[in-house]
Every structure is written in C-alpha cells, then in structure tokens.
Amino acid sequence: MKILGITGGSGSGKTTLLRAVEQLGGLGLDCDAIYHRLLETDDALVAAIGARFPGTVRDGRVDRPTLAAVVFADPAELAALDALTHEAVAREVRRRLWQSEAPFAAIDAIGLFESGLASLCDETVCVLAPEETRIERLIRRDGISRERALARIRAQKSDEALRAQCGHALWADAPTPEAFQQQCEQFLKGVLMMEETKKFEKEREALLSSPKNGYDRISEADLAAMESYCKEYMKFISDCKMEREAVKWTIEAAEKAGFRELKPGMQLKPGDRVYGNNHNKSVIFAVVGSESLNEGTHICAAHIDSPRLDLKPNPLYEDAGMAYFKTHYYGGIKKYQWTTTPLAIHGVVAKKDGTVVTVTVGEEPGDPIFCVTDLLVHLSADQMRKTLAEGVTGENLRILLGSRPLKDDEGADRVKFAILMLLNEKYGLTEEDFLSAELTMVPAGPAREVGFDRSLIAAYGHDDRVCAYAAFKPLLDLGTPVKTAVCVLADKEEIGSVGISGMQSQYFEMFMEDLCEATGASKRRCFEHSFCLSADVSNAFDPLYAETCDPANNTKINYGTGIFKYTGARGKSGSSDAAAEVMGYVRRIFAKHDVIWQTGELGKVDQGGGGTVACYMANRNIETVDAGVPVLSMHAPREIVSKLDPYMTFKGMKVFYEEN
C-alpha cells in the first residue's frame, strides 16, 4: 500500500485533498477526526488531558472550545497537548492501515512530522492557502471569531516551514471549491497515484475474473442491432407456440433465403443451402462449407417444444352446465401456475378422410380465450394446507370452454353438444376426430416488453425457442463458411428427447448421412471432427430465490450468453461434461469477436438439476458444450429474458458458424 502524508494549517484545504483520495478508491485517515473520536472513546486520554489542563474536562467529557482557547493562545501549551495526543492518534492510524485493503492511503495531520506519522508515508504534501482565505474558512466552518481564527493560524507552522519538510506543495488558490476539487484530483493522478493505480488495475485485470454487466461493455452498434434483432424475435416467438408452427415458420423463411429440401442422391457444392423436414415436428438446416465434411461441421442444436397442456384423446365433457377439455400436461410444470392464465388452443386434427385441419383459437384480438379455474380463497382452507405440488393436481388442469346450452334441445350434455356444433361448423370436426388430434393449450397473446426501460421480454416458450431462433437466424445471411454449418431444431426435449422427432431419433443420422454422401464424405469422420453448441436456456439468478443458487456459478440477466461445461443432476448425471479444450475453444472465438458471455451451472449441488440435448450429440462422438440464454421464471406460462442475452447468443452462434 502506498501512503501519502498530507499536512497544512487549519483551513488550508487538506480535507478536500483527503476526500479526493477517497473518491479515487484510497483510504482517507483524518487525524483531526480520529482525535475527536478518541476524545469520546479513550478514557485514559481524556483523564490525562484533564490532569494537564485543569478545567477543560467536565463530567468526563472534554470541553473542546475551552481547551482550544488555552492551547492556541500559548505555543508551549499546544506542544504539551500534542505530546499527549500524538501517540494515541498514531496508534489508531496504524490499526486502520493494517485492517484496510485499499490500494493506497492518505494521512491528513497538522502535526504529521511531530507525531512521527510521516515515517509511515511514501510521499508528503503540504496544502497551502492565503491567510485571509483560511480565516474565512475557519469562521464559516467552526463558528469562531476572526480573532480566534487568526490566533489558531499564527500558533501553527508557517508556510515556509511546511514547504521545507514536505516533498510536494499544493497551493489552494482555485477560484471555486469545485475547481480546487479538480485540482486535487489532478494532483493525485498526475503526481502521486496514477502510475501505481494503473499497475494495480492491470494486475487485477490480468489475474482476476471480474464479470461486468453487458450494458457496460456493449458497443453502440451492437445496441442498435440488439433492438432490431429482438423485435424480429418477438414476432417469431409470438407466431410459433408449438413445434409444428416453428418448423413451418423456419422452412418458409429458409426457402426465401435460397434453401431447398435435401433429397437422397443430390450432389452438393460449397455454398449450397439445404434442409430436412422431419414429419413437420423437427427440422435441420445446413449451409455447405468450403472444407470437406470429413473435416467436421459446426452444429447448433436447439429444441422447439415447450411445456404445455395437451388434450387427452377423449377430452370433451360437460359438468354442472359447463363444458371442459381434459388435459395431460407435457414437460415439467408447476401446475398451480396454469390456473386462471388466459390460454389459446393450437394444433392439428387428422380427420378420418385423411385431411389435416389446423386449429388456432385465442390469439387474434377478437378471439375468445380459455382457462383453468381456481378455487376461491374463501373456501381454500384445506387446499392451502397442501404443498404447492399438491394444491392443484394434474387431473384438475381442465380447460373451461363454455356454458351456453343448445337451445330447444332436450338431450343430455347440451353445453358439450353446443361446443361440438361450433367446432363442426368451423372445422368440420366430430367428437371422434379428437382421437387423431394434436391439440394443445398454451398461454394466449404475443410477447411483450417488460419494464419502464423495455429491457426485458416476457413470452411463452423462451425455453427453448429463444435459442432456436438464435441458432437459425444467422444461416439466412450466411455466405459460404469454411466448416459446413448445421442448425438442428428438435422436438420432445422437454420429455427426454425421445420419439421420432426427438434428438435421440435416427433422423439426425439420416440427414447427416445424406449430406455427407452428397459431398463425398464419411458420416463417421464427419462426426469425429464436428463441434456442437447445444443451444438451450439456463436459469438466470433470481435474488428472490437466491438460496437455490451459487451466485458465483450461476448465469445472470444482462451478462451475455451462458456457457455450461455440464448440466445434469445428482453428481452430473445425464451430462456430457465438456472437455477443457472444448470450453477453451468457445472462450477463444467469443473473445475474438466481442461476444459477451458468462458461465454457470444449474443451481446449487443437489438442489435439483436438468438436462439438454448435449449428451445425445456427444454420444455420437461430437464434441459438445451447452450454450444459451439465461431465463427468469423458466417453465412458467410466461418466461422472461433480457434483450441483451438473446442478442449475444445470436452473435455467438453467428461467429461460431463463420469460424474455422
């Protein structure tokens, strides 16, 4: 620690210089303030003063005005007081210096040299000011008369004596207090502290990890691009609330950008753009690179399914004059969150004649919405005694559809019959058609900006369509990369990546085999040299539930895309656990292209856990690491992300596709 000694007469401006030290991050030690504090806390010192200067201590407290009148009128008396106080003050100064972790400190003392404190200092400076200025300051600051102010000044060292003792002098002749404050800061930076501080800061930056909020790092150009990107993303997430809709949306956008469907037997060359549609439930896109696929590909793999309420095969029924849909929830949800939430119905119905009908109700401004009812608080005594998991059961997640019975009908279930007639009139459906339907209930309404500053986005299905869009979007404008760029948008991740459209299916192998054959490469060699970013969301640190996370190892809002070495639970179970070299590669390319990123894990050890598609890609001998957007309220009907993190995830995916 470098220590600066500050001295000067009363009213010279020493305190201003000391405050400037503190504003630059240093420790300021005001010996006058320390002395006054000791007069209140050091009984031995007070007793010694009372014995040496009778009449100056009353009821155990020093009468400071009386003591000042005595000592400033007689230099010998002042020297006697200094002899009593210097040792106590010096002892307290040493204690505070020893406890401090500041990079530098300053000791402000009129008797800097007499007390021996100057011996602790690397540099010394005297602060000087015109006598008349000092008098005015003392009158204004201490409320004393002009005569007493002058007597105090005359009892102290002359300017010449101070200059002779100190290595530096600072003349406090600035026209305003603000100007003198700037003068003090310039003095400290330019003459004493700056070189040492710069060296210290460089060492800290080189040795310590000091994550910064992304808004303190992002460029103006990226800020503008972020707003544009997020506006487009909000349109996508509002339009695509189930995997079929995301597949249709991305294929249409890709075809406009020159993509065509990959067929067996096709011959491809660098720059060609192809896709594979897997039963309208998952999709893969690729841009062929200049390098052989035997040298590997760069893959971004995300999923486009989200937790929801799926209709049961026989969903429609009536009870107590109201019609309902029975549901079976899909993925991990907190069931109580879905009550009273406005819901829309999305999906398709495959009719007996082979036609497929698309159904969407609840999204347009004039549409009705649907909901799961909840129990009124007045009758909730039993319910409230249950756990959150038990308070609302999965079987009771039933969708209220209507209550108006069919007029002039005397049969049973008149409300149910009326609902079926409406569905038949609009879609040509019968009750039996529900047996071959994929209909799901999702939160109604578009994505919305959150907060007065509009810095956040609330929407259904950020997990994982926020990463799916970030993985897909760069391909639309991608030229011919060195490594072939592949984007996988998979289904069924929320229930284990199983089934024909999940990441564990053979469809990915089939597509990659066709892609390799079309370019004369080996799929096995291709996988061996490929690299995959498993693009999935992470849990953003929420201070309201801080006890579930290790803050030093948890992603945060506005700190960029999150990179995860591993996920899983109970000892990393179900994780691919990326190698150090894999993490190092991602660090390197993100740093090279100014991608703001962070790292973390899913909560405290044994708090819970979760998985991604990373392990299924790694099982194919593809180097894989998780990367994605931090999310608040994950798996809730409305999830929240910041604007900065999705944009940085997009930027990271983009440079990953472009990187060799």
Show which residues each predicted segment covers.
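Hydrophobic anchor at the beta1->P-loop junction of P-loop NTPases
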Residues: 6
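ATP-binding Walker
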Residues: 12
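Walker A/P-loop
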Residues: 15
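ATP-dependent small-molecule kinase phosphotransfer cores
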Residues: 33-104
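Small-molecule kinase domains that catalyze NTP-dependent phosphoryl transfer to phosphate-bearing small molecules
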Residues: 92-93, 119-120, 140, 144-190
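ATP-dependent NMP and nucleoside kinases share a basic, alpha-helical "lid"
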Residues: 94-99, 104-141
